[in-house]
């Protein structure tokens, strides 16, 4: 209430930024955009002030039959289909890798389903995020034009919202060996189709500081200080083929203290990979009954879930999904999926392990998942574990030194 009495407060205009412009960076001239190719896009000039959190990948291409004619109406690109075409995404600072995302389609889907809100859907369509089967990303000729914000693909771009100064930044994309997971064909005996990437460019904001801010920034970096960058990176692990049992123990990895998990997201897909008749952007519940995450001897959640999905008993699973946004983003939750759509499209198990006791605050941390289902896991079931953990990077703007803290 004191604010309404502050009539003496002066009017202040924020003129700290003199100019803000978007620049497009292309891959090296010799780069091709075929399956298994590696695409490198580099910001060569280091005497810049850039804002990677607002950068985006601009991707153009065509989705046609093998003879370049239009595909049938029953053949569509799936949600984040272009993500399925990128096997690996890497972000480098001064030649040092600071962030990596493998199996970009699955990683961005698992993170997106728990992070996005319904009011973002219209904007997300421009990035290739479509959840309705009747929404097409291509025109009649099969052309598509997408602008994918980097914060959908990288924890670095999502969390680090400040500018970078005197840094050579580079992204490396490895294109998948097949594009079959990027589309779904609903008709029997469907035609041969192909996805052709025609152009990839990186749209990056350049920020020009006002004279006052520029002098302050230059005075600060003159002593070559170690500037800390803290963000949460997304690490995907895959169990390609679950055994035909109703209970399974998965020793995922052993992590360092700094990079121990803060959140773990578990998802299953049954016979969806490399099958054009199945939507590779959806997940299956596999009649999941219980899930436990163990960090050394500490378990999350504390009690059993005791789900019975066949009897419509999965309220706890949906609650774990809706609670993610309030703890991860410190805001009121606005879940993307309704309870029914959650079960149909993305029944993910979201485990919050961000609050940890003294028992796991020293030494290495063993990460183990134990899960069971009401029935045996179906044949050709793949389990995905997305681990979200902290990462700290330090860089010196004058000496161009970059190091990851572990």
Residue ranges and their predicted role:
Residues 1-406:
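Short, low-complexity Pro/Thr/Gly
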């Amino acid at each position: 209430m004191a604010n309404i009495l502050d009539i003496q407060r002066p009017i202040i205009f924020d003129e700290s930024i003199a100019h803000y412009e978007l620049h497009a960076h292309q891959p090296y001239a010799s780069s091709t955009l075929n399956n298994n190719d590696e695409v490198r896009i580099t910001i060569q000039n280091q005497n810049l002030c850039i804002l990677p959190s607002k950068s985006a990948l601009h991707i153009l291409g065509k989705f046609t039959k093998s003879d370049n004619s239009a595909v049938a109406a029953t053949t569509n690109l799936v949600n984040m289909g272009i993500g399925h075409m990128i096997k690996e995404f890497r972000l480098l600072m001064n030649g040092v890798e600071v962030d990596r995302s493998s199996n970009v389609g699955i990683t961005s889907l698992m993170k997106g389903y728990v992070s996005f809100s319904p009011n973002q859907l219209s904007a997300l369509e421009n990035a290739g995020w479509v959840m309705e089967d009747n929404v097409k990303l291509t025109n009649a000729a099969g052309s598509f034009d997408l602008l994918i914000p980097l914060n959908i693909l990288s924890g670095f771009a999502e969390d680090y919202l400040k500018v970078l100064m005197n840094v050579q930044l580079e992204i490396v994309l490895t294109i998948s060996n097949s594009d079959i997971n990027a589309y779904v064909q609903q008709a029997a005996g469907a035609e041969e189709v192909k996805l052709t990437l025609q152009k990839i460019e990186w749209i990056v904001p350049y920020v020009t500081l006002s004279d006052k801010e520029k002098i302050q920034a230059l005075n600060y970096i003159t002593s070559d200080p170690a500037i800390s960058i803290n963000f949460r990176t997304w690490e995907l692990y895959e169990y390609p083929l679950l055994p035909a049992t109703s209970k399974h123990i998965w020793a995922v990895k052993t992590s360092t203290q700094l990079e121990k998990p803060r959140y773990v997201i578990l998802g299953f897909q049954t016979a969806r990979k490399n099958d054009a008749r199945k939507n590779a952007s959806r997940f299956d519940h596999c009649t999941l009954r219980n899930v436990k995450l163990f960090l050394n001897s500490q378990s999350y959640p504390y009690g059993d879930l005791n789900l019975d999905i066949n009897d419509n008993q999965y309220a706890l699973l949906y609650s774990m999904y809706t609670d993610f946004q309030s703890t991860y983003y410190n805001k009121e939750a606005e879940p993307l999926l309704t309870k029914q759509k959650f079960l149909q499209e993305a029944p993910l198990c979201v485990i919050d392990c961000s609050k940890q006791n003294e028992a796991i605050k020293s030494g290495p941390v063993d990460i183990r998942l134990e899960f069971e289902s009401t029935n045996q896991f179906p044949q050709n079931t793949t389990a995905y574990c997305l681990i979200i953990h902290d990462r700290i990077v330090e860089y010196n703007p004058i000496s161009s030194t970059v190091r990851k803290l572990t």
